[in-house]
Swiss-Prot record:
Annotated GO biological process: L-histidine biosynthetic process; L-tryptophan biosynthetic process
Active site: D8 (proton acceptor), D128 (proton donor)
InterPro entries recorded: Aldolase_TIM, His_biosynth, HisA_bact_arch, Isoase_HisA-like, Isoase_HisA-like_bact, RibuloseP-bd_barrel
Reaction equations catalysed: 1-(5-phospho-beta-D-ribosyl)-5-[(5-phospho-beta-D-ribosylamino)methylideneamino]imidazole-4-carboxamide = 5-[(5-phospho-1-deoxy-D-ribulos-1-ylimino)methylamino]-1-(5-phospho-beta-D-ribosyl)imidazole-4-carboxamide
Enzyme class: isomerase
Lineage: Bacteria, Pseudomonadati, Gemmatimonadota, Gemmatimonadia, Gemmatimonadales
One Pfam family here: His_biosynth
Organism from which the protein derives: Gemmatimonas aurantiaca (strain DSM 14586 / JCM 11422 / NBRC 100505 / T-27)
E.C. number: 5.3.1.16
Superkingdom of the source species: Bacteria
PANTHER family: 1-(5-PHOSPHORIBOSYL)-5-[(5-PHOSPHORIBOSYLAMINO)METHYLIDENEAMINO] IMIDAZOLE-4-CARBOXAMIDE ISOMERASE (PTHR43090:SF2)
Annotated family: Belongs to the HisA/HisF family.
Keywords for this protein: Amino-acid biosynthesis, Cytoplasm, Histidine biosynthesis, Isomerase
Compartment(s) of residence: Cytoplasm
Protein name: 1-(5-phosphoribosyl)-5-[(5-phosphoribosylamino)methylideneamino] imidazole-4-carboxamide isomerase
Length: 237
């Protein structure tokens, strides 16, 4: 079980949102490079970078992500608006260990299969979830797709993992959706990483007990509610 700090990018800065709502931005830090370095120095051995602007189609942070990847002291997974093969290739060329694909991987089964086979072991499929339904396009659209059905459809693909975000709990620091995460872990053939509401070491232990491979953490780390050094000592590697 590994703890993975999130570096969410918006307008060239590091931010944290509440409940997946772009109007509720609770954290904004001007220097994402410094933020990422601090997480590495604290003892975390993996990083999660998301381009929120690209996810919503309102811009992109490609040059900043390239700089973050080249500067990083630890393996990095990158997502947000990754919807074509050339972007996957560019991210890997720039140094991403894994690429997180969401909206197009949900909506286009043929593309999902083609990309997974073209980049075996390098793709993490994101299932952003609200009320057990998969949401897409930067959490703006809710599909009719049940998350368990979706995760089961990924079984034959050579993935690096599945990232499940409980969007309804994102940034609220009220704990994560344990029943959801447990059900996804049971349904998945691949390592499952939880995101959304993970706030305490108790949350981490509960996820570990339910078979999760790791968790992406944001608000609890940025606000100091969760002791970053202690978390890194227990779940940094």
């Amino acid at each position: 079980m590994i703890a993975i700090p999130a570096v969410d990018l918006r307008g060239g800065q590091c931010v944290q949102l509440v409940g997946g709502d772009y109007e509720q931005e609770q954290v904004r830090l001007a220097d994402p490079l410094s933020v990422a370095r601090d997480w590495s120095r604290t003892g975390f051995t993996r990083m999660h970078i998301v381009d929120l602007d690209a996810a919503t189609g309102r811009g992109q942070n490609h040059e900043l992500i390239r700089d973050l990847l080249r500067d990083s002291m630890v393996p990095v997974q990158v997502g947000g608006g990754v919807r074509d093969e050339s972007r996957i290739e560019r991210l890997i060329d720039d140094g991403a260990e894994w690429v997180v694909v969401g909206t197009r991987a949900v909506e286009d089964e043929d593309w999902r299969e083609e990309m997974a086979n073209r980049f075996p072991g390098r793709l993490i499929v994101a299932a952003d979830v609200r009320e057990r339904r998969v949401v897409t396009r930067g959490w703006a659209e809710t599909s009719r797709l049940d998350v368990i059905d979706f995760v089961e459809s990924l079984r034959t693909l050579p993935l690096a993992g599945v990232l499940v975000t409980a969007v309804h709990l994102e940034g609220l620091m009220q704990g994560t959706d344990l029943p959801l995460m447990e059900d996804v872990a049971e349904a998945s053939a691949w390592p499952v990483y939880a995101s959304g509401g993970v706030t305490s070491l108790e949350d981490m232990r509960a996820l570990e007990h339910r078979g999760l491979a790791g968790a992406v953490l944001g608000m609890a780390l940025y606000t100091g509610v969760l002791d970053a050094r202690r978390l890194a000592e227990e779940y940094g590697a």
